[in-house]
């Protein structure tokens, strides 16, 4: 029998000097250390930081969902 569930969505930004994929992994791995039961991460936005005409960081904004625990 299925039970009703509620999920919370929060946004995080991952940063990497290597790639957008690594930036996303960094965000998920870091969030997983303090948030239980992560379910889905959706890429909301990608951008880069630039210094002296060169890309120095890849940034990914993720909307991450996790199951809400009511405390009951």
Task: Tell where the protein language model's regions lie, with residue ranges.
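Short beta-strand/turn micro-motifs at beta-sheet edges
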Residues: 1-3, 50-53
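Broad gene-expression machinery/nucleic-acid interaction feature
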Residues: 7-9, 45, 57-63
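Generic "edge-of-domain/loop-turn" microfeature
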Residues: 17-19, 48, 67-71
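Short, conserved loop-to-beta-strand elements that form functional interface hotspots
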Residues: 41-50
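C-terminal structural segments of small proteins and small subunits
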Residues: 53-72
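Short, well-ordered alpha-helical segments
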Residues: 4-40
């Amino acid at each position: 029998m299925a039970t009703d569930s509620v999920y919370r969505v929060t946004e995080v930004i991952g940063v990497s000097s290597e790639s957008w994929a690594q930036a996303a992994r960094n965000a998920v791995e870091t969030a997983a250390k303090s948030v239980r039961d992560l379910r889905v991460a959706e890429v909301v936005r990608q951008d880069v930081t630039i210094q002296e005409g060169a890309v120095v960081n890849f940034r990914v904004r993720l909307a991450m969902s996790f199951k809400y625990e009511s405390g009951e």
